[in-house]
Amino acid sequence: MLKLFLSEVSQSINTCVINILIFSFFNKVYGKKYQSRILYGVAYIGAVTAMILVNQIQIAPVNLLYTIVYMDVLSVWLFRADFKKFWLYNLIFLLILFFSDAITFSFWSAIRGDSYGEIILQEELTAISNLLNILVMFLGYRIVLAFLCKNDMNCLLYTSDAA
């Protein structure tokens, strides 16, 4: 019971961090459309809540579809995303999420020799995997943002207020 609770809490923390990174990434790459912190705060809370609910379904294609639609809608509604470019940047961020998950589970698979399904069924490994996933996501986020913003002076601010 405690292991399941820790697994759920770590998944929720992971979801919060994913959304912090998405909002931060979009702010750096696109720029905010509005000045209201309340609007972005409410949008963040709504996004985290919705993502946690979708994650509870535990159907990978549904999670992926939700994440794609959510990122596209968010980038257009709350950020100054150029319609021609936002598909590419959103795909890049989606790849960060995908590869961080793949790297995390590959790590456990290499160390323990377990398959993805076996790792998922072990709540303590899932909890630790979620925390490791956060680290890998953050590193991927920083690397990609540094690459995308190397010639853009507005993006250089990310070093002082990263996530």
Task: Give the label of every model feature segment.
Residues 40-48:
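Alpha-helical transmembrane segments
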Residues 1-7:
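Short, strongly hydrophobic alpha-helical membrane anchors
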Residues 12-13, 17-38, 52-157:
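Juxtamembrane segments at transmembrane-helix boundaries
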Residues 158-163:
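Conserved small/polar residues in nucleotide/adenosyl-binding loops
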